[in-house]
Structures are given as structure tokens and as C-alpha cells.
């Protein structure tokens, strides 16, 4: 490879050199020993760095100040369990359908506000960005599974509407994580599941870096 071609490759917009993950999706997942970068992408085509920013870090520091200098790509991925737990639908029984829907709507409003602020931080950074939908849980109890899936659909609808309005592309994790082997527990992904998500997300970032301008859905 000639020096010029090497320089062109290093400057290519699809080269992920510093990925910032906005969200807590990796917070409770055991990626094993060593660097998270190696667990997510075992054989990368170039050295890269991962910075994870929890939502409070972004919201407390202010949008622009939270994103580190040198970021080349951003992914927004929030733990779906957070949304479900906040809704309160899996704890006890509502007095009526109206009460249940009101509780869910209030939790979805709070979630949407937080998620919108994360998207604003990403768009202000001006780098290729993807938004991930919430990963569905796999509860053993059928009734719990139905309730969780219903609640998750409401939160994911908020994500899809906001991401589309912001012209951000989407990784649809409900279609990516569709096998039992993708899960280490009812609510946490396995190494295989995390690797699958990383592969789809990486492909999405490569694509939108070279072909920006419109919202796409990847799975």
C-alpha cells in the first residue's frame, strides 16, 4: 500500500477511531477480562477507543462538554430494563387499565425526555450517529413477558419517532437479539448477543459514514 493510499484510508469517514456510547446498555454486562474494545470487536481493522458515558454524565455536565474531543462516531444505547423498571408495570397490579396506561405514559414521557437530550448531545457533536432500540427481555413467566413486551413497545415507539425526526439511523435490536443464545439471563445479553449487536452497529456506522443524509433501519 502506498503512503497516499494509507493516508486516504486513515482519513476515511468510515474508520471508527473513537466511539462514544451514550447510555447504560453495557453497565451490567460482563465482557470478561481485558479491554471492552477487544470483547466487542476481537479483530478490528484499525485500533479504536471506546468511551462510555452514562446518561447522568451527559445530562449533568451539559451536552457539548460531555462529549470528549476526538470522537469520530456515536452510538446511543440504553438498557431496556431501566425503562421497564421505571414504568412500574412489573410491580404489583394497577387498579384499572387507565391507571396502568397512565403509569406507562408517565414513565415513557420521562424516558423520552432523557433520550431526546442524549440525541441532542450526539447531533451537536456533528459525527455519524446511530440510535439503538431497547433490547427486549426474555422472562420465563409468559404473563410477565407479555407485559414487558407491551411496555417496551411504547418506549421504542418514542425512540423511533425521535430518531426519525432527527434524521438519525436506527439499529433495531428487537430484530437483532432474537435467539435464546443472545441472552445470559432474562434481562442481560450474553457475550454472543453483545457481539451480534456490535457487529450490526459497526456495519451501520460504516454505512452511514459513507452514505449520510437519510434515516435507515439496520438489523
Per-region residue spans from a language model:
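Residues in flexible loops and secondary-structure boundaries
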Residues: 30, 34, 178, 196-197, ...
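Generic detector of intrinsically disordered, low-complexity, polar/charged segments
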Residues: 20, 29-31, 72, 129, ...
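A sequence-level detector of short, solvent-exposed, charge-rich linear segments
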Residues: 38-41, 89, 93, 213-216
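Serine-esterase "nucleophile elbow" of acetyl-processing enzymes
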Residues: 1-58, 64-69
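Alpha-helical cap/lid subdomain in secreted, periplasmic
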Residues: 62-191, 195, 199-202
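Conserved catalytic region of serine esterases and O-acyltransferases that act on ester linkages
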Residues: 2-5, 13-18, 63, 67-72, ...
Amino acid at each position: 500500500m502506498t503512503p497516499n493510499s494509507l493516508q486516504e484510508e486513515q482519513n476515511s469517514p468510515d474508520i471508527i477511531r473513537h466511539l462514544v456510547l451514550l447510555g447504560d446498555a453495557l453497565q451490567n454486562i460482563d465482557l470478561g477480562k481485558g479491554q471492552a474494545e477487544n470483547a466487542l470487536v476481537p479483530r478490528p481493522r484499525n485500533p479504536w477507543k471506546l468511551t462510555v458515558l452514562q446518561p447522568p454524565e451527559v445530562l449533568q455536565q451539559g451536552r457539548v462538554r460531555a462529549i470528549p474531543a476526538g470522537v469520530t462516531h456515536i452510538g446511543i444505547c440504553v438498557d431496556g430494563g431501566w425503562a421497564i423498571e421505571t414504568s412500574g408495570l412489573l410491580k404489583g397490579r394497577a387498579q384499572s387499565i387507565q391507571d396502568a396506561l397512565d403509569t406507562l405514559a408517565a414513565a415513557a414521557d420521562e424516558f423520552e425526555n432523557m433520550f431526546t437530550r442524549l440525541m441532542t448531545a450526539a447531533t451537536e457533536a456533528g459525527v455519524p450517529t446511530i440510535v439503538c432500540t431497547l433490547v427486549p427481555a426474555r422472562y420465563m413467566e409468559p404473563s410477565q413477558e407479555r407485559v414487558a413486551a407491551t411496555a417496551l413497545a411504547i418506549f421504542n415507539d418514542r425512540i423511533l419517532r425521535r430518531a426519525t425526526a432527527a434524521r438519525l439511523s436506527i439499529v433495531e435490536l428487537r430484530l437483532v437479539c432474537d435467539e435464546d443464545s443472545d441472552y445470559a439471563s432474562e434481562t442481560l445479553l450474553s457475550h454472543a448477543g453483545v457481539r451480534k449487536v456490535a457487529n450490526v452497529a459497526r456495519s451501520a456506522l460504516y454505512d452511514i459514514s459513507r452514505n449520510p443524509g437519510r434515516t435507515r433501519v439496520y438489523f
